[in-house]
């Protein structure tokens, strides 16, 4: 702003993904004050920084006649012909657009900048828009880079970023739009997703949710605020620049990569003989170690991976069994993923909570969330759902975990093929523990009523052995599911009021695992009073505190969990007092079990 006399205005629109989501920047520049309290609908310049967006959004819709369109991609003209939707080709041609491409992803990788393409694309922006003279823009950008990085990172990092500016200017490619694009015709793509996903979720993910009528919400029973589980598996964002590729010959089958994956996008798969005969071409498997009846494969979902590289970093194989490769080269793995999760059954005899490897053969009931690439919180949530997910009640405090855990229309908590999975809800920041307590007390009240009806049936001689077996196992986490199923089977043809009540409330038959999730801002500070009350109750309730030692979701303010002298982004002066010992305070009751865990330090202790 200081480099020009122009007035400027900026509006930003974004989704609730913590990273890898959509951000729209609406910029205006002019010689007089700008008084336009609305978004840009006729733009001189439109840039698309993520190639996959051309298939998700109408990227050229708001481009002016004769405007400039910049696409960050690695496609030449043949690649553009193959990959651009017909509708976008027609729009660019009919608006006589000036069309440019730049492969910022490859440039960043070549310069050692990883996936950071922002400086490259900023240089391209100044080159194409002429908001300020390009020489002045380069000088200003390089001065800013020096001030930002020289003292903290050194001259090498400064040089890398300076080079990215030069490449952003020099490697722009102007595309001559073929005349044939005026009447481009595409091949219709069949959408096999459920009606709810097509009618509601996909519309909202296209940022068009404001056009949905109330009648659509009523049609799908959403008027009470409930939302179907497991919608994230239909998003297939393709947000990664690179994704891991599994080398079967080097793999030691430790499953550590699956444990640390923040998005459940890499999973160990076990196949029996029947499934082996049905596997698609290219679905390489090897004999499973310690499980001779099965074959083994580590499967990656390229469209759901965010490319963080945590799996590569944790690999215990001598020569590393995972290698990061460009996303485009691995899209062929998508059908393999579909086969692995849809056609291959979870092998219950291989699942165990006794060791890390066996725990990862369990289904994660938390997948493909909007958490940041490499998130350190979500692996813990995912692991908890692998252990207890089919019978969990979860309440969530405000914070990162609520943003990636349940921001409409994305629901990462999912169900298995039988329809079992976590029930998730969020109330206020300050009453999350009390909310979980209410969950517990409410389902206990219903269970007492159920027990009375089951007892009445037993006394009436209706399947007395089955009824008493249920009563004996109703609060046993390991056996209540089996006892509940047996009870429902025995009462299938019974028309009594007792049996009808049981059928209507069958979801409460099994022993529930009630959890309160939240960060240190909730547990140490804002919600501590309620948390203390619930812990003191002595009730069978669980709490997962995702302790990042700062208020993460709001940018990085210090909390009572922040260590003494620690500097946070918005607390640069350093913490003057020491970290609150929440675990010790809870243990002082004498009947509260506390486990302090760090997956990176000791995965086995974390699991225990």
Regions found by a protein language model. Name each.
Residues 34-37, 41, 108-112, 132, ...:
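Alpha-helix capping and helix-loop boundary segments enriched in small/acidic/polar residues
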Residues 68, 78-93, 334-351, 412-423, ...:
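Acidic, Ser/Thr-rich peripheral helices and adjacent loops at domain boundaries
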Residues 68-74, 397, 543-547:
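Short internal beta-strands
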Residues 1-206, 275-280, 564-568:
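Active-site cofactor/cluster-binding pocket
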Residues 16-21, 37-41, 61-63, 91-94, ...:
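Solvent-exposed alpha-helices and their adjacent loops that cap or buttress functional pockets
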Residues 344, 404-405, 414, 495-496, ...:
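Thiamine diphosphate
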Residues 20-23, 58-59, 80-84, 111-113, ...:
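Short acidic, glycine/serine/threonine-rich loops at helix termini
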Residues 137, 141, 153-305, 312-393, ...:
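Ferredoxin-type iron-sulfur electron-transfer modules and their immediate structural context
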């Amino acid at each position: 702003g200081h480099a020009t006399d122009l007035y400027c205005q900026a509006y930003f629109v974004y989704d609730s993904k913590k990273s890898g989501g959509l951000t729209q920047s609406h910029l205006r520049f002019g010689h007089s004050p700008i008084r336009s309290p609305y978004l840009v609908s006729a733009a001189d310049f439109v840039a698309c920084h993520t190639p996959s967006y051309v298939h998700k959004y109408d990227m050229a819709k708001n481009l002016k006649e004769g405007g400039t369109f910049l696409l960050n991609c690695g496609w030449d003209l043949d690649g553009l012909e193959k990959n651009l939707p017909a509708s976008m080709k027609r729009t660019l041609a009919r608006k006589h657009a000036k069309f440019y491409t730049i492969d910022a992803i490859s440039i960043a990788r070549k310069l050692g900048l990883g996936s950071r393409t922002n400086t490259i694309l900023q240089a391209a922006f100044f080159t194409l828009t002429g908001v300020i003279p390009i020489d002045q823009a380069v000088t200003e950008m390089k001065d800013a880079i020096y001030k930002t990085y020289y003292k903290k990172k050194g001259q090498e990092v400064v040089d890398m970023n300076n080079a990215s500016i030069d490449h952003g200017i020099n490697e722009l490619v102007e595309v001559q739009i073929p005349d044939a694009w005026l009447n481009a015709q595409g091949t219709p793509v069949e959408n096999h997703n459920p009606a709810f996903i097509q009618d509601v979720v996909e519309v909202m993910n296209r940022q068009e949710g404001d056009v949905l009528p109330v009648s659509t919400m009523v049609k799908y029973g959403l008027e009470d605020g409930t939302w179907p589980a497991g919608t994230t598996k239909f998003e297939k964002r393709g947000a990664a620049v690179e994704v891991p590729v599994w080398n079967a010959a080097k793999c030691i089958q430790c499953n550590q990569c699956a444990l640390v994956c923040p998005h459940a996008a890499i999973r160990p798969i076990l196949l029996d003989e029947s499934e082996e005969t049905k596997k698609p071409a290219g679905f390489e498997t090897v004999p499973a170690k310690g499980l001779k009846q099965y074959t083994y494969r580590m499967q990656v979902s390229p469209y759901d991976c965010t490319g963080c590289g945590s799996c590569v970093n944790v690999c215990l194989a001598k020569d590393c069994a995972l290698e990061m490769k460009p996303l485009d080269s691995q899209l062929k793995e998508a059908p393999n993923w579909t086969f692995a999760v849809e056609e291959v059954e979870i092998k219950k005899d291989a699942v165990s909570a006794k060791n890390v490897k066996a725990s990862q053969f369990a289904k994660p009931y938390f997948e493909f969330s909007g958490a940041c690439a490499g998130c350190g919180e979500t692996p813990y949530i995912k692991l908890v759902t692998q252990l207890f997910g089919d019978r969990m009640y979860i309440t969530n405090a405000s914070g990162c975990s609520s943003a990636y855990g349940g921001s409409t229309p994305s629901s990462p908590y999912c169900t298995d093929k039988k329809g079992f999975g976590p029930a998730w809800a969020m109330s206020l920041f300050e009453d999350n523990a009390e909310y979980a307590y209410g969950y517990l007390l409410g389902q206990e009240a219903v269970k007492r009523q159920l027990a009375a009806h089951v007892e009445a049936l037993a006394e009436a001689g209706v399947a007395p052995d089955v009824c008493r077996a249920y009563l004996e196992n109703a609060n046993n986490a390991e056996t209540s599911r089996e006892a509940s199923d047996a009870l429902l089977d025995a009462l299938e043809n019974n028309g009594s009021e007792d049996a009808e009540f049981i059928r209507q409330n069958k979801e409460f038959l099994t022993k529930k695992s009630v959890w309160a999730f939240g960060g240190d801002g909730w547990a140490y500070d804002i919600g501590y009073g309620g948390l203390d009350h619930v812990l003191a109750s002595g009730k069978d309730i669980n709490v997962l505190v995702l302790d990042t030692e700062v208020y993460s979701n709001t940018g990085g303010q210090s909390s009572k969990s922040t260590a003494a002298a620690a500097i946070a982004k918005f607390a640069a002066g350093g913490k003057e007092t020491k970290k609150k010992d929440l675990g010790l305070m809870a243990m002082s009751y004498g009947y509260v079990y506390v486990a302090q865990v760090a997956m990176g330090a000791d995965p086995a202790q974390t699991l225990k």
